Amino acid sequence: MYIVETKDLYFRYPDGTAVLKGINFKVKKGEMVSLLGPNGAGKSTLFLHFNGILRPTKGEVLIKGKPIKYDKKSLVEVRKTVGLVFQNPDDQIFAPTVKEDVAFGPLNLGLPKEEVEKRVKEALKAVGMEGFENKPPHHLSGGQKKRVAIAGILAMQPEVIVLDEPTAGLDPVGASKIMKLLYDLNKKGMTIIISTHDVDLVPVYADKVYVMYDGKILKEGTPKEVFSDVETIRKANLRLPRVAHLIEILNKKDNIPIEWGFTIGEVRRNIVNYLKEKC
């Protein structure tokens, strides 16, 4: 059984624009999955189906094996399981202080005050934002706002966190910190689904990758399986990770037959092995 699954999912906006065109997407409990695609591929629209914000034109979304029902009571249960973090944290953060914002979700669950305070404290600690409880969110940096948005979802204690472009607008250091946070949450058992077009981060963190283009899934598999399909990557208007592109150049232009790798560690090992063999 998959914790999140879509079957033959189609979606059209009221003006008739077709955005999703037969999406089949499966995530197992405990996985960290990346959805890769250029802007306009339909990634955000797909994610809005995972907790029932959007309703498919055709097909279905299943959470823990059960199709989503769109009555109010059923959607509350779905959103206890699947938490969604928007690309722009300013779309999600609205309370006067960090503490109040993170507390908003648990309070809406009707939890007692003591439990809400406990969850807020734990969530802020998990994202490294202890000490910011009384800060106004608009005084925070972009990376700090992302962390507060994630904390707000963590405080709901979902089984799955879905993040739309979590590194968008961040500098490289900020992006790495957010991805390390998500990686650590995943290692503690949280199922993580992210959308991104940052191909350099994906091989480092993801268990499984989907490539999306023009409302369709072009490829799925491990990072190695996906990035080895260079033709599909370029068809989706994406590029190879920079280290893999270096190997491609060495292979094709310099006739140096170094084995493919997709992270710095893999490529370093493959280059060292090649040099040892040559010596």
Swiss-Prot record:
Domain ABC transporter residues, every copy: 4-239
Q: What is the organism field in this record?
A: Methanocaldococcus jannaschii (strain ATCC 43067 / DSM 2661 / JAL-1 / JCM 10045 / NBRC 100440)
Q: Which is one GO molecular function term here?
A: ATP hydrolysis activity
Q: List where in the cell it is found.
A: Cell membrane
Tell me which Gene3D superfamilies the record gives. P-loop containing nucleotide triphosphate hydrolases
- Biological role stated in the UniProt entry: ATP-binding (A) component of a common energy-coupling factor (ECF) ABC-transporter complex. Unlike classic ABC transporters this ECF transporter provides the energy necessary to transport a number of different substrates.
**InterPro entries associated with the record:** AAA+_ATPase (IPR003593), ABC_transporter-like_ATP-bd (IPR003439), ABC_transporter-like_CS (IPR017871), ABC_transpr_CbiO/EcfA_su (IPR015856), Co_trans_ATP-bd (IPR005876), ECF_ABC_transporter_ATP-bd (IPR050095), P-loop_NTPase (IPR027417)
Question: Which EC numbers does the record give?
Answer: 7.-.-.-
Q: Which GO terms describe its biological process?
A: cobalt ion transport
What SUPFAM superfamilies does the database record attribute to this sequence? P-loop containing nucleoside triphosphate hydrolases
Task: Give the range the annotation lists for the signal sequence.
Answer: none
The way it spans or sits in the membrane comes to: Peripheral membrane protein
Q: Keyword Iron: yes or no?
A: no
Q: What is this protein called?
A: Energy-coupling factor transporter ATP-binding protein EcfA
Name the protein family. Belongs to the ABC transporter superfamily. Energy-coupling factor EcfA family.
* Subunit description: Forms a stable energy-coupling factor (ECF) transporter complex composed of 2 membrane-embedded substrate-binding proteins (S component), 2 ATP-binding proteins (A component) and 2 transmembrane proteins (T component).
Please, which domain of life does this record's source organism belong to? Archaea
